[in-house]
């Protein structure tokens, strides 16, 4: 069985329509933060009822969020997805990311001066204890999705806050509006960058697996010439990809591991910290 994350927006509604005849269950999260939230939920409910599709809904109303709302919402969302995934014994979760998301994520990474092992978003990966699949990531642009929905007369909701330059992704998205040729050039550039990284990625994965077999001991880490990459994978794996690491932060972590001083811990964020216990590197929750 496949789990499909459906917000009621155009991308996820097309994804749902494409897979409606498969063995699926739908998960919808309503943050009740926008006036149109109830409308989006009803769109999903009506479609699932009409097509006899199993639907699980999470309604959130607690907004005592300390820090970044998007980080909080993402954690709540994926915690819920994991529960549904396990309840129905799903083999994968489908997400509706498309080519525009692919380009935007790359530009966000560049803006934040990040140096990921793989630029932008993978079509398939394993995270949060789930097999994640993004069928549209190299298939459709946003404008293509909208045309298909119009032709098939599929109802969907538009998030009106996307037009507001509140968040970095919104600013990048709005800056790329009507710049189709530029988006395509950036898309091709990302594919080339990732292609030339393949050999390096294989070597890094070998080093990481070797380090993992040694229970993430300090000595094996120090032997690798890919320390920055090992830290990125290690932190991502141990925190379910919940921490955005800048290059500066990665360098601080490496300095902490290398240090012979009796430093007990390195704070990663409000939830996680790093420790050196008998020359073994660990990520712990506060």
Swiss-Prot record:
Pfam families: ATP_bind_3. GO terms for biological process: tRNA modification. It is an enzyme of class 6 (ligase). The keyword Nucleotide-binding applies. Its main location: cytoplasm. It comes from the Bacteria. Its EC number is 6.3.4.19. It catalyses: cytidine(34) in tRNA(Ile2) + L-lysine + ATP = lysidine(34) in tRNA(Ile2) + AMP + diphosphate + H(+). GO terms for molecular function: ATP binding; tRNA(Ile)-lysidine synthase activity. InterPro entries: Rossmann-like_a/b/a_fold, TilS/TtcA_N, tRNA_Ile_lys_synt, tRNA_Ile_lys_synt_N. Keywords: ATP-binding, Cytoplasm, Ligase, Nucleotide-binding, tRNA processing. It is found in: Cytoplasm. One of its GO terms (cellular component) is cytoplasm. ATP binds at residues 7-12. The keyword tRNA processing applies. Ligates lysine onto the cytidine present at position 34 of the AUA codon-specific tRNA(Ile) that contains the anticodon CAU, in an ATP-dependent manner. Cytidine is converted to lysidine, thus changing the amino acid specificity of the tRNA from methionine to isoleucine. The N-terminal region contains the highly conserved SGGXDS motif, predicted to be a P-loop motif involved in ATP binding. PANTHER family: TRNA(ILE)-LYSIDINE SYNTHASE-RELATED (PTHR43033:SF1). Belongs to the tRNA(Ile)-lysidine synthase family. This is tRNA(Ile)-lysidine synthase.
């Amino acid at each position: 069985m496949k789990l499909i994350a459906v917000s009621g927006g155009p991308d996820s509604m097309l994804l749902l329509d494409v897979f409606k005849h498969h063995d699926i269950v739908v998960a919808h999260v309503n943050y009740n933060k926008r006036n149109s939230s109830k409308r989006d939920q009803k769109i999903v409910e009506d479609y699932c009822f009409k097509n006899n599709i199993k639907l699980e809904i999470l309604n959130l109303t607690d907004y005592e969020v300390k820090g970044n709302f998007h980080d909080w919402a993402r954690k709540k969302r994926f915690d819920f997805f994991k529960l549904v995934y396990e309840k129905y014994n799903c083999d994968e979760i489908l997400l509706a990311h498309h080519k525009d998301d692919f380009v935007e994520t790359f530009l966000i990474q560049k803006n934040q001066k990040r140096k990921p092992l793989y630029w932008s978003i993978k079509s398939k990966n394993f995270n949060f204890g789930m097999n994640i699949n993004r069928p549209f990531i190299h298939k459709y642009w946003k404008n293509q999705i909208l045309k298909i929905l119009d032709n098939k007369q599929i109802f969907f909701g538009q998030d009106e806050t996307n037009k507001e330059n509140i968040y970095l992704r919104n600013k990048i998205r709005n800056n790329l509006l009507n710049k189709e040729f530029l988006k395509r050039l950036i898309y091709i550039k990302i594919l080339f960058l990732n292609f030339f990284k393949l050999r390096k990625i294989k070597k890094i994965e070998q080093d990481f697996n070797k380090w993992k077999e040694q229970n993430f001991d300090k000595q094996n880490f120090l032997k690798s010439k890919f320390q920055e990459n090992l830290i990125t994978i290690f932190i991502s794996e141990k925190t379910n990809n919940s921490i955005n690491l800048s290059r500066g932060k990665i360098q601080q972590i490496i300095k902490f591991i290398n240090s012979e001083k009796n430093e007990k811990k390195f704070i990663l964020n409000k939830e996680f910290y790093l420790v050196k216990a008998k020359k073994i590197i660990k990520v712990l929750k506060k």
